[in-house]
């Protein structure tokens, strides 16, 4: 699975990259909104981890632009904005999931696995 991380906080972006690589994901990281939109528009990613508050272009604008372009890559918003209204706005903008900072690594990895199962039409045995 190839994941794009769009996060301007370098320490967090680097930590996410390391964690994801340790879990056998291929990862690209970008730190600015316009770069994130360019990378995400390539269509080569299986998942995008997207911050909302980014320099140059905010994450919601990136998300809405991707959806307008019919790019359906799953997106998990990772953001400090944790009000219910923020979550609703993010999901209504086209996000597949929303995780407020700070978050646990285990929860993030579980959400990635859940989205991966859905996108692969996973049918687990009971």
Feature names for model-found ranges:
Residues 1-122:
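N-terminal/domain-start alpha-helical segments
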